[in-house]
Amino acid sequence: MMQIERLSPDEYAKIYTPQHVFNSVDFTELNRDKAEDLHYLSIHDTKHRFGIILGERNGMLRSPFSAPFGGFTTRGVQTLERMEEAVDLLLAYAAERSLQLVVTLQPLVYDETQLSKWTSVLTRKINVRCTDLNYHVDLQRIADYEQIIDRSARKNLHHAQNVPFNLIKLNSNDLKDVTRAYEVIRRNREERGFPLRMTLEQVWQTVSNVV
């Protein structure tokens, strides 16, 4: 039988290796001021099996609390039964503190098999607010990309191919290059009326200290 335990950031980092940057201790600590409290949790029996980082804010435990997605960090392959038990323990942890729980999983492209299992478990344990459509295409499995898209998409593709442009790989360790990339995104968001939630300084701190 497993139990849930709250750890310090250092303890958590020594045990769990994140599958993506948003589940890392470094990224979490960089954004600590965006939550009222942080909960580094380990779910284990004789072995540490599941870790999750939650930000507490406005009566809710959120994973993530300041990122596109979060979810569990798993040590090795775990059974569905253990995954279900882990979610039950997490729900009990939140209920004991009179807190709601919100978990946003990463896109399936990150780990289709494991994330499909988490989706199955979570949809049976908690309410699903929304499911994002996944538009990624695995080009390694497709011989001719143009043959799987419709006529209007092919037309747009050919138009884009006829526009002269260069692809330049920028240096993420160079503030000037990061600023250049940030400005492209900022202008795009501004022209489309979408909010930009991170300042250049926040992006630079993330890139230089975490990524």
Task: Describe each PLM feature range.
Residues 2-60, 106-211:
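A conserved beta-strand-loop-helix scaffold within acyl/acetyltransferase catalytic domains
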Residues 59-127:
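Acyl-donor binding region in acyl/amide transferases
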